């Protein structure tokens, strides 16, 4: 019957409207990321085939010191700061960052660059992933969850 089609069509419209409400923030990632982010959970591991006794893994809310990345402030001018968990700024206080697709590149200097993948971002939550594989088969993996500070 034609009524069935109308119902399906209506549900489709409602469904779309619904998801539009949830997607209220259509700004580019480079704008959404601006601000201060406070670490709330960190997990990851370090594996080194050459020194397996040094392998480690973690999965916990932040303690006194962060495992791999701390709190961040990203600024519109393309600079960022990383902070200790007690709020003090790290020595390398202001560095540059860029973003392409969903990858943030932290540029500490011409030799030190870190690529962080944005797994999730909402108005008050950010999940970043760092995954680095060495030539020797070793790997450093870290996943950090933040709340807006």
Predicted regions and their residues:
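Lipid interaction determinants
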Residues: 19-149
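Single conserved hydrophobic/aromatic residue that forms the stacking wall/gate
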Residues: 1-11, 15
């Amino acid at each position: 019957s034609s009524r069935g089609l109308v119902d399906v069509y209506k549900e489709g419209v409602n469904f779309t409207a619904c998801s539009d409400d949830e997607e209220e923030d259509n700004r580019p990632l480079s704008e959404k990321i601006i601000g201060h982010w406070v670490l709330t959970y960190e997990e990851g591991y370090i594996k080194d085939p050459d020194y397996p006794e040094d392998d480690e893994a973690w999965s916990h809310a932040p303690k006194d010191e962060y495992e791999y990345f701390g709190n961040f402030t990203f600024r519109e001018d393309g600079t960022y700061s990383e902070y200790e968990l007690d709020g003090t700024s790290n020595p390398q206080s202001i560095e540059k960052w860029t973003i392409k697709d969903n990858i943030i590149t932290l540029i500490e200097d011409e030799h030190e660059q870190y690529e962080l993948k944005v797994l999730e971002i909402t108005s008050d939550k950010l999940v970043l992933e760092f995954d680095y594989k060495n030539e020797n088969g070793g790997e450093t993996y870290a996943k950090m969850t933040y709340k807006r500070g």
